[in-house]
């Protein structure tokens, strides 16, 4: 996954995998201070929208994750 433009990643909300494909939901902060929520594959940005740290936005990201998991996507194990 790549950083687009002058944005810096703040947090990864989730990582999913299915048949060798990966998706990540990442919050970025741009040079202007605004936050962006991106769902990214290894090759492309699938969703890119403004993000405000509000329960509604976090619930939307969680609902997308749950919908993908119902369709066969699995959590990527985290290593520390």
Residue ranges and their predicted role:
Residues 8-24, 31:
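N-terminal acidic leader/helix
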Residues 43-56:
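A short, exposed loop/beta-hairpin motif centered on an aromatic-Gly-Thr core
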Residues 53-70:
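A short, charged, amphipathic alpha-helix used as a generic interaction element across diverse proteins
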């Amino acid at each position: 996954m790549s950083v687009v433009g002058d944005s810096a990643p703040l947090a990864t909300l989730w990582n999913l995998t299915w048949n060798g494909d990966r998706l990540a939901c990442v919050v970025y902060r741009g040079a202007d201070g605004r936050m962006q929520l991106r769902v990214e594959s290894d090759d492309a940005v699938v969703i890119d929208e403004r993000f405000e740290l509000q329960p509604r936005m976090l619930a939307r990201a969680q609902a997308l994750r749950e919908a993908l998991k119902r369709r066969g996507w699995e959590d990527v194990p985290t290593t520390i």
